[in-house]
Structures are given as structure tokens and as C-alpha cells.
A protein has these predicted regions:
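Short hydrophobic/aromatic beta-strand or adjacent loop that forms the aromatic wall/cage
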Residues: 19, 126, 194-196
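Catalytic core of non-heme Fe(II) oxygenases with the double-stranded beta-helix
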Residues: 104-169, 203-217
């Protein structure tokens, strides 16, 4: 679907299939700038600590403390309109840059919302967006996923005969997928790394995976666009969850306390 699509149509496809690929979410210049800046950050980023992170995979945590190149992506109007429909009140949970190196093994299939002990079935809790900065191919580690698995009954896990597809997508596009969709990074069988960014959003009443109020220094957070500040956690979940000494956290941030 193109980025000019109506948000209702994107949300309907996302909820029905568990995922949707939207083209034209970032222009070529934005992709080039983001790739170059993440290459800079990755120069001092270690590889993973375990098989899930990937022993030859680098992950840029605290993303919004280290680069400004995804500020606009995180607040893309179509993305926020879809999130308004699917999650209503939401926040950034786990934004991370991921570079899968040559020789990396396939990640186990998993659900991102399984970290929350909420009885099933439940409404959508997590929506991910995956932004490729290189071509994602079946050979270089493109994400694998099982279409429709977001709607599986409680307790069902992937079987050998479940149809696994590969997210072959190009830079400038973004794949939206529910946190209940079974998925995992693919094996990189090429001699070149593949780079992308995941922006994960979660319902506003859940604990964020990354504590952005500590990960992003206050002096950096003060300079961010207001909507991005809110998404990082400087916000209130209605009616008053998240206040600071009786005040809105964004007011405290602006005051320099």
C-alpha cells in the first residue's frame, strides 16, 4: 500500500493480516542520511550478547539519544493515524537500529507482546514498524513471519509445516506488524551486512521496554519535537497516570527540573 493510503485502510489490513507493507514512507535522501548516521553510531556498537540478539548482529539501543534521523519517521502522520485507530493511547517502547552481519543465524520466531502477562485473547498491545535502510532479501536476513499468526488461539506455537514468509522490502518502505505476529530475523547468508530500524509502539498503560527518560538525556529530550517527547514517555495516560510531583512530565522537562 502507498503512504498516500487512507489510515483506515491500512489499519484494516494490519488487523486482518497481522502486517502490512507501506511504500513511500521515507524519501531516498532521508534513507541515505539515516544510513550514514547509523553507520557512524555502529562504529562503536558491540555485537549481541546472546543468540536472540545475534552474535554477529549490532543493535543501536537508546536510538533517540544517538541520532536525529528517525525523528520524522517516528511521528509520520500516517503511522500515528494508524496507531490512533489500533492502540488509541500509545508510546514508543523499543526503538532500535539493527545491523545483521554476514554469517548471522536465523533468530527464533517469537511474539513481541508475549513479555506482557495479559490473558488472551486481548486487544492489540504492540505495533511494530520496520524500516529497511538496505534492501531486505531472503539471503541477507530479511525478517521471517507467519501471516495470520496474530490470530492464533492461545498456546499455539509455530510448527514445521506453518507457512513462513520473508519480508522482502526496499528502503523507503515500512512494514507495520502487530506484536502478536510470530516473526524473527533471518539468517544473513551474504558477505554484506543489512541495516534497518525497528520502532516499536505499545499501549500507553504498559511499561516501555526501554526506559527512555533515562536512555535519552534530559538536555537532548528538551530539544525534541513535542510529539516525540510525548512518545518517549513525557506524557500522561488518561486520566493522570505518569504525573511528576502533581504536574505533567512535559512541563517538568521544559522547566529543566
Amino acid at each position: 500500500m502507498p503512504a498516500t493510503s487512507d489510515s483506515d485502510d491500512v489499519a484494516i489490513r494490519l488487523l486482518a493480516d497481522g502486517y502490512v507493507v507501506v511504500t513511500g514512507m521515507m524519501d531516498a535522501a532521508g534513507v541515505d542520511v539515516a544510513r550514514a548516521d547509523l553507520d557512524r553510531v555502529l562504529g562503536t556498537t558491540p555485537t549481541g550478547r546472546n543468540a536472540f540478539e545475534g552474535f554477529t548482529t549490532q543493535r543501536v539501543y537508546a536510538l533517540f539519544a544517538k541520532t536525529r534521523t528517525f525523528d520524522d519517521a517516528a511521528t509520520h502522520p500516517l503511522l500515528l493515524a494508524v496507531l490512533d485507530e489500533v492502540l488509541r493511547h500509545y508510546q514508543l517502547s523499543a526503538p532500535v537500529g539493527i545491523r545483521i552481519g554476514p554469517g548471522e543465524q536465523a533468530q527464533i520466531l517469537h511474539r513481541d507482546d508475549s513479555i506482557y502477562p495479559v490473558p488472551e485473547p486481548h486487544p492489540p498491545l504492540v505495533v511494530n514498524t520496520m524500516w529497511p535502510l538496505d534492501e531486505f532479501t531472503a539471503e541477507n536476513g530479511a525478517t521471517r513471519f507467519i501471516p495470520g499468526s496474530h490470530a492464533w488461539e492461545r498456546g499455539r506455537v509455530p510448527a514445521a509445516d506453518d507457512p513462513v514468509e520473508t519480508a522482502v522490502i526496499s528502503p523507503g518502505s515500512a512494514m507495520f506488524y502487530l506484536g502478536s505476529l510470530w516473526h524473527g530475523g533471518g539468517a544473513n547468508q551474504t558477505d554484506a551486512p543489512r541495516l534497518g530500524v525497528i520502532l516499536e509502539y505499545a499501549a500507553g498503560w504498559l511499561r516501555q521496554q526501554e526506559n527512555h527518560c533515562l536512555a535519552v538525556p534530559r538536555e537532548v529530550a528538551r530539544e525534541l519535537p513535542q510529539r516525540l517527547q510525548e512518545l518517549l514517555g513525557y506524557n500522561i495516560y488518561p486520566p493522570f497516570v505518569g504525573y511528576v510531583d502533581g504536574s505533567h512530565p512535559r512541563e517538568v522537562l521544559s522547566a529543566g527540573s
